[in-house]
């Protein structure tokens, strides 16, 4: 029995019964409920930030829960308690007679710790009381001005190793970086602890939402606390930074990613669901609830979710959608759109009818009116990665599998780079009368680290840093914009182990000879033998080639089995999220690391994890901050701390000693 369950056991008239119902789950999550400890406080909120209260209550056999109420600090919450049973629609293992009691969209303006409780009564009058706690984090007196704009740059999977590798590719000599990364020039740096609510190793959903809700979510869940129902869209909610600042200040929201826009990181800024894969409902929520988030810019891949079912490339289904009754408390209390099962919906046309410009290509993006909201969908699912986009633009590497470039194989030769998307997003959002929150994600740092495709994630990190430069330049010019650069987690346990001791030509010859003796013992240079790899940077900001002599070598500590020859992979792996992945030429792409052409080298690196991909790690990740309020981001912090620091800067003003990091434009790197 949980130590915080207080059984108010009322005897029957005969005095024969002393049983009572049991509270099996209490939300928001707390150690007080789970273990009886008051510390640490798990759930924290801003003054006035909205969240849901919920309890799962199992009655005695043959009984039914007939009433429930919630209290905060002993005072009843003055809101309707919705009560439903689990006769249908609950997860496996939850008894059918279990009742779920919910109060939607509560808030507290009183700073400090609070105890909340649920009191539930079953049909025979037996009662149960369970307690939890949460904290309202106060705003503090400001020492500086409020920030008008917040830009969050999220390098998905980008740990310290990924940042370091990109810096080395940018140029090193005698131990010094020749062309420091833009993110290296930021004023302040912190280390972020990344764990989710249910694991030391987070996935991208809670990795993102922790930054913009102030609370931990379970893996695979976005903007919600876990519950016992199977419905992916009815979980207890917590208000996002975008929703809070739009509701209280009128700020607008921009979301930019190189992934499919339904993916965990972009969705984790505006969408509430316990299933990060429920694509139809996720993109519907972007549009239908834009009045709650202020969504003004949405760019990335993911066209398949916006096209009516039956259209070639469409992935819309009713099974990944939602529909609530207009009388549902979720609709009434949160003000959300009820939704409908409408797989035939044409969301592109609906965005356009609502006044959004639509850009399916870079050419259309360049022409889009910066005074109008913007929808950009440049691929059916994830966009191509930087290495393949750059090769497509240069026209020199015909490394696709149908005679052209990789982007030609995907049918998407005119995709923008992330920095181009970032610049356009800022040009649109700077017209926001009350300021904006903008999230920019370099998504395939993570996706290519999963694939253990070193050169592709290194160039995606360079692409991401070019977007960082765009944001930094804007912040420097405006003086009222706080920019942070961080990651949701590290991916693959990447380790920069040294440099090749041979030329690329010799490396190719050794690969042909095969085996460990040639590809490890004859190639890997450690310590002083690693030297300084020299990548020549072209005018477009990327290496002329990644197959250089004496190249940088990267190993992995969280890898699956792979074959390694250290050379650039000719093609990316097959992206199974693409709607045409089973058709030529995309079906010809390798399914995993063991099916690549370099498997012919027969140097098998045995993995530490099962499956075909490298995995996320629990390693802390760097965070760099620039602009007013940057100096609040120092030390070792929890990912949820970031939310409160951002909100403080936007709502009350800068609290760290005044800094002028946004007042002077940083120098551009010289070539």
What are these regions (language model features)?
Residues 86-91, 148, 155-209, 218, ...:
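A post-motif C-terminal structural segment
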Residues 51-61:
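Aromatic/hydrophobic beta-strand junction motif of beta-rich domains
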Residues 105-113:
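Surface-exposed, short loops/turns at beta-strand junctions within beta-sandwich domains
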Residues 1-19:
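Gram-negative bacterial Sec-dependent N-terminal signal peptides
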């Amino acid at each position: 029995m949980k130590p915080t369950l207080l059984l108010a056991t009322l005897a029957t008239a005969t005095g024969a019964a002393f049983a009572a119902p049991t509270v099996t789950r209490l939300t928001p999550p707390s150690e007080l409920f789970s273990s009886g400890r008051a510390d640490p406080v798990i759930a924290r909120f801003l003054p006035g930030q909205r969240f849901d209260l919920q309890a799962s209550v199992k009655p005695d056999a043959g009984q039914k829960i007939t009433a429930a109420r919630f209290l905060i600090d002993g005072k009843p919450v003055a809101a309707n308690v919705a009560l439903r049973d689990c006769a249908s629609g609950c997860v496996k293992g939850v008894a059918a007679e279990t009742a779920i009691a919910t109060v939607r969209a509560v808030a507290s303006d009183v700073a400090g710790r609070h105890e909340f409780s649920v009191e539930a009564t079953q049909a025979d009058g037996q009662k149960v009381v369970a307690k939890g706690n949460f904290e309202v984090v106060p705003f503090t007196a400001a020492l500086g001005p409020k920030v008008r704009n917040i830009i969050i740059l999220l390098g998905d999977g980008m740990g310290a190793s990924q940042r370091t590798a990109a810096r080395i590719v940018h140029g090193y000599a005698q131990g010094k970086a020749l062309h420091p990364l833009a993110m290296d020039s930021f004023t302040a740096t912190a280390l972020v602890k990344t764990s989710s609510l249910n694991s030391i190793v987070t996935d991208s959903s809670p990795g993102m939402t922790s930054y913009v809700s102030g609370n931990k979510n379970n893996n695979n869940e976005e903007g919600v606390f876990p519950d016992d129902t199977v419905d992916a869209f009815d979980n207890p909610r917590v208000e996002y930074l975008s929703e809070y600042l739009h509701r209280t200040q009128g700020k607008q929201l921009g979301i930019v990613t190189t992934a499919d826009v339904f993916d965990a990181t972009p969705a984790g800024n505006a969408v509430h669901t316990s299933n990060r894969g429920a694509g139809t409902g996720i993109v519907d929520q972007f549009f239908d609830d834009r009045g709650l988030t202020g969504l003004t810019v949405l760019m990335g891949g993911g066209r398949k979710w916006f096209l009516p079912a039956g259209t070639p490339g469409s992935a819309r289904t009713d099974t990944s959608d939602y529909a609530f009754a207009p009388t549902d408390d979720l609709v009434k209390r949160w003000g959300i759109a009820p939704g409908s099962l409408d797989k035939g919906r044409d969301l592109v046309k609906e965005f356009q009818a609502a006044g959004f410009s639509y850009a399916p290509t870079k050419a259309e993006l360049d022409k889009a009116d910066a005074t109008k909201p913007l929808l950009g969908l440049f691929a059916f699912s994830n966009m191509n990665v930087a290495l393949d986009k750059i090769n497509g633009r240069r026209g020199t590497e015909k490394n696709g599998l149908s005679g052209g470039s990789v982007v030609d194989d995907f049918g998407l030769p005119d995709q923008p780079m992330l920095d181009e998307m970032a610049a356009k997003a800022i040009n649109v959002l700077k017209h926001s009368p009350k300021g904006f929150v903008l999230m920019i994600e370099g998504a395939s740092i993570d996706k290519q680290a999963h694939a253990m495709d070193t050169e592709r994630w290194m160039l995606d990190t360079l692409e991401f840093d070019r977007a960082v430069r765009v944001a930094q330049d804007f912040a420097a010019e405006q003086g009222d914009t706080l920019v942070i650069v961080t990651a949701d987690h590290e991916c693959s346990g990447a380790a920069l182990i040294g440099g090749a001791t041979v030329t690329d030509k010799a490396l190719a010859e050794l690969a042909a000879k095969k085996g460990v003796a040639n590809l490890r013992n004859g190639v890997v240079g450690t310590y002083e033998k690693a030297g300084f790899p020299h990548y020549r940077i072209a005018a477009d900001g990327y290496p002329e080639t990644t197959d250089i002599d004496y190249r940088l070598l990267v190993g992995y500590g969280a890898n699956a089995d792979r074959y390694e020859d250290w050379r650039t992979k000719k093609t990316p792996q097959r992206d199974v999220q693409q709607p045409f992945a089973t058709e030529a030429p995309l079906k010809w792409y390798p399914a995993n690391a063991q099916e690549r052409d370099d498997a012919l080298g027969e140097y098998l690196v045995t993995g530490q994890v099962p499956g075909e991909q490298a995995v996320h790690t629990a390693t802390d990740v760097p965070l760099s901050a620039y602009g007013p309020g940057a100096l609040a981001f120092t030390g070792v912090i929890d990912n949820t701390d970031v939310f409160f620091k951002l909100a403080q800067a936007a709502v009350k003003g800068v609290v760290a000693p005044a800094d002028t990091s946004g007042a002077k434009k940083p120098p551009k790197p010289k070539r």
